[in-house]
Amino acid sequence: MYKAYRFRLYLNDSQRILIHKTFGCARFVYNYFLDKCKKVGYIKAYDMCKELKGLYEEYPFLKEVDSCSLRCSIFNLDDSYSNFFAKRSGYPCFKNKFSKQSYRTNCIRSTYKGTNYSNIAIFKKDNQIKLPKLGLVNIKGYRNLKSINGRIINATIERECTGKYYVSVIVEEVEIVKSKKIPTSIVGIDLGVKDLVITSEGKKYSNPKELLKREKQLKRLQKKLSRQVKGSKNYAKTKIRIARVHSKIRNSRKHNIINIVNDIVKSNDIIVSENLNVKGMSKNHNLAKSIIDASFNMICNMLKWKTTIQGKYYYQVDTFYPSSKTCSRCGTKTDITNNLSVRKWTCENCGNENDRDINASINIMFEGLKIHYKTI
C-alpha cells in the first residue's frame, strides 16, 4: 500500500536558490522536449532520456541540479501524452514559471561495502529529511514521525503561492487493513449546506462556512490588487496575502471534515451516504458557492478511505434515490419537499412529523442496509 506524507521544509538560503534552479531546469527540459515532439512527432521517454545526456554539454547549467529530477520531468511529459492519446486530457501545454512550481525525484538505493545508502531518507530523531543535492533539510508536519515505516519511492518538492516549501514523500508500506468484522451499528448521513452532516441518529454537525467568514477580507485584498501595478513588488506581496487567506480557508475546512469523519467512523460499523451530483447542484447560482465550500466529495472520499483501513463498510445510495421525498415511517412519497424552504413536514398518510434532513438520513440508512445484504 502506498501512502503519502507531506512535510513543510525549512530551507537555508543556498538550498532555496538550488530548489529554484531545479524548478527552472525541470521546466526547461519539459518545454524543450515538448517543443521537439510538436515539430517531429511523439518521441518515446526512453529516447528522450538518451538525448538528455547530450543537452548537458549544450546547456551546462543543467549539471548544477539533480539529474533524476530532469528524467522525472521527461516521464511527466510522457504521462501527459499517454493521457492525451487515451482521451483523458487535452494536448500537453508548455509550462511557465508563474504556474505551480514543483519537481519530482526518485529514491535511488545502493550498497557499498555492506552498507546501504539512499539519496532520500527521513531522520525521525532529528526531524530532518535528506534530499538529492539539497542535503539535510529541517521538516515539520507530523507529531509522531516514528509511525512512518516503509520503503521510500519518490519525493515531490513544491513551492506554494504562500511562499512556503513542502515535500511530499511516497512510501510503500505493508498493507495493514483490518479484516471485515460483523457489523453491530449502522448510520445514514445526509449532506447539507446549513448543517454539513446530519446523521440518522439525529446528530447534526454544523457547517463552519470558512469561505463566508473570510469573504470580506478576500474582497478587500482583491480590490487592492486590482489597483496595483502588475509585476510590481507590492502586487506580488498582495498576491501572497491572498494566497495565505485561501490556504487558511482550505486548512480549516479540511481540519473540520477530518474531525467529523473520525467521529462518525469511530462509533459505527456501516456508514451510508448519498452519491451527490455536485456538478449538477452547482448550477444553482444561489447555492453554488456554499455547495463548493462544503466539499461534499472530500467527505465521501475520506469516509471511504477510513472505513477501508479500519475494516468497516461504506456504501453510497443512488443519486436519484428520493430520500427527502419519502416518509421514513410508512414509505409514502410527497412533493412538498421540492421546495427547499420546507424544513419540516407532516406525512399525509401516517401523520408522522418529519425533519427534512433527519428523515432523509434515516431513508439513506435503510437503503444502505439493503445494499449491504445484497453484497455479503
Positions of PLM-derived features:
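Nucleic-acid substrate recognition interfaces
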Residues: 1-376
